[in-house]
């Protein structure tokens, strides 16, 4: 498309979304559930065709030299599609929060004042790589009574088109407007610039992808932005802790899957347990091919681990989101230094402490400035599905409006409602 056509095309998407948003907002819980269950069924019925479309994206990605983590994020396996279907079903079974009134109270004047939860209206979603985000965003849009415009990465265009077609079918089956969820069908990057500059039609933009993408959108957008920044997640092994449990959790947090933003990228270890803990986790990482970039003190312990891939950490390593079998390792004096290190280098996504000390755990929960803070659990649990939110639109590292996994409530706002019986202000 030429520039003029891109402007006209995105404008039409905005107009159609705005019209559809009114009908989406009025939809009953039963109608929205019908659409979600239809989408779950269609996903299961179309696993093979979806994988055929996905294969074209994967072949193109490999030919274009995309990194292994990026290719992994592109892959639509039967397990990934089943998780998407289950997310739709979980959302369908959840209570509908739209229209609920909270905090209703009687005022001295006689009026009653409360707040009603309502859809945002239209949100734009810009994301890279993961085609399953198309389903996560669409299903949350349906459940929350919003319309949305989705712009996936060019590397996943065939997969996204196929998934968006299923969403349109599910909406039609439920009697909802097919324009309630729209996919930007062009890979022209100018479409992104137009989408983030349509305040008359788009109420909020949610970018999900690399740091460069999110910084660009945050800088150029003319509508509010809910940011999903990178995930430099930390696991801190405290003194005292259950060493066996700590080894198990630190292993899972790093090696369960390397490409998600909730994988741990930095391992902090209290000096008092380092000599016992590091050789055990080091042996596991070595066996799985994980490179350990450590401080001099940690390397002195890890050098005895057979087959260990070791390197001295640089200052940049403490801030790095690897999305790969690499982890930075640092020995700290204790919980004070761990908290200070995390608050300095973390991306404020998800950080965990593994400890037997209740006071250390409470301090960590209070003082670590991240969207999700965990005690004795893997950072890999930082996920809307695991948190019982159904699907998630992303994990916000912002402090306003939505923070952490953004589910249904993150796609709503509250308006004041006032109920009276003829009261007038004196």
Swiss-Prot record:
Pathway: Amino-acid biosynthesis; L-proline biosynthesis; L-glutamate 5-semialdehyde from L-glutamate: step 2/2. It is found in: Cytoplasm. GO terms for cellular component: cytoplasm. It catalyses: L-glutamate 5-semialdehyde + phosphate + NADP(+) = L-glutamyl 5-phosphate + NADPH + H(+). Its EC number is 1.2.1.41. InterPro entries: Ald_DH/histidinol_DH (IPR016161), Ald_DH_C (IPR016163), Ald_DH_N (IPR016162), Aldehyde_DH_dom (IPR015590), G-glutamylP_reductase_CS (IPR020593), Glu-5-SA_DH (IPR012134), GPR_dom (IPR000965). This is Gamma-glutamyl phosphate reductase.
């Amino acid at each position: 498309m030429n520039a003029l056509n891109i402007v006209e095309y995105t404008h039409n998407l905005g107009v159609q979304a705005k019209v559809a948003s009114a009908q989406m907002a009025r939809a009953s819980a039963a109608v929205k559930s019908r659409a979600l269950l239809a989408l779950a069924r269609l996903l299961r019925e179309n696993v093979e065709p979806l994988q055929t479309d996905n294969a074209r994206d994967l072949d193109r990605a490999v030919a274009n030299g995309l990194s292994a983590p990026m290719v992994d994020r592109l892959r639509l396996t039967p397990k990934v599609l089943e998780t998407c279907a289950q997310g739709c079903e979980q959302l369908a079974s959840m209570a509908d929060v739209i229209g609920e009134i909270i905090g209703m109270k009687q005022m001295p004047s006689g009026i009653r004042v409360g707040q009603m939860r309502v859809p945002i209206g239209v949100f734009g979603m810009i994301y890279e790589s993961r085609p399953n985000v198309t389903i996560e965003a669409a299903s949350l849009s349906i459940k929350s009574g919003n319309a949305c415009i989705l712009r996936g990465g060019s590397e996943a265009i065939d997969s996204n088109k196929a998934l968006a077609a299923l969403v349109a079918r599910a909406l039609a089956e439920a009697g909802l407007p097919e324009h309630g969820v729209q996919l930007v069908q062009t890979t022209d990057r100018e479409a992104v610039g137009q989408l983030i500059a349509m305040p008359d039609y788009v109420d909020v933009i949610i970018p999900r992808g690399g740091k460069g993408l999110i910084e660009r959108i945050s800088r150029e957008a003319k509508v509010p932005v809910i940011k999903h920044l990178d995930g430099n997640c930390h696991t801190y092994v405290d003194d005292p802790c259950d060493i066996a449990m700590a080894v198990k959790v630190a292993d899972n947090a790093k090696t369960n899957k390397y490409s998600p933003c909730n994988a741990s990228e930095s391992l902090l270890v209290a000096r008092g347990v380092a000599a016992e803990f590091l050789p055990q986790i080091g042996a596991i990482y070595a066996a799985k091919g994980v490179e350990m970039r450590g401080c001099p003190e940690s390397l002195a312990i890890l050098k005895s681990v057979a087959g260990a891939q070791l390197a001295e950490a640089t200052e940049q390593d403490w801030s790095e989101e690897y999305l790969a079998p690499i982890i930075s390792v640092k020995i700290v004096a204790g919980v004070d230094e761990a908290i200070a290190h995390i608050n300095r280098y973390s991306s404020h996504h998800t950080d965990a402490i593994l400890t037997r000390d209740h006071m250390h755990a409470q301090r960590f929960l209070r003082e670590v400035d991240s969207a999700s803070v965990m005690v004795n659990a893997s950072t890999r649990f930082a996920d809307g599905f695991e948190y019982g939110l159904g699907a998630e639109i992303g994990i916000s590292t912002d402090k306003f409006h939505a923070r952490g996994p953004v589910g249904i409530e993150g796609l709503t706002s509250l308006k004041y409602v006032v109920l009276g019986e003829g009261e007038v202000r004196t």
